[in-house]
Amino acid sequence: MTFENRNNRKTLTGKVVSAQKTQKTIIVEVDRYKKHLLYGKRFKKTKRYAVHDEAQVAKVNDMVMIMETRPLSKTKHFRLYQVLSTASDVEKEAK
């Protein structure tokens, strides 16, 4: 695989909703906004992805970027690419 093809992989941004329950796996919720074909109203679709976290750095409520990869198990087809913001950063901004 060339380096150019590696950059064409799908990347998604979402929130970690489950971590440290299974080794090296986190669950990330990704929100997408779609438009109804007939009525035109926008609505939110949420999908949960099982993501491989080799270093186990992601915690619950972290915002992360995930990247598509080869199938690692029956449900894991994404890996952790980058932690965008941690849960403690989000709490500090809220106060």
Curated annotation (Swiss-Prot):
It holds the Pfam family Ribosomal_S17. GO terms for cellular component: cytosolic small ribosomal subunit. Signal peptide: none annotated. GO terms for biological process: translation. Keywords: Ribonucleoprotein, Ribosomal protein, RNA-binding, rRNA-binding. InterPro entries: NA-bd_OB-fold, Ribosomal_uS17, Ribosomal_uS17_bact/chlr. PANTHER family: 40S RIBOSOMAL PROTEIN S11 FAMILY MEMBER, SMALL RIBOSOMAL SUBUNIT PROTEIN US17M. One of the primary rRNA binding proteins, it binds specifically to the 5'-end of 16S ribosomal RNA. Belongs to the universal ribosomal protein uS17 family. NCBIfam families: PRK05610.1, uS17_bact. This is Small ribosomal subunit protein uS17. The gene is rpsQ.
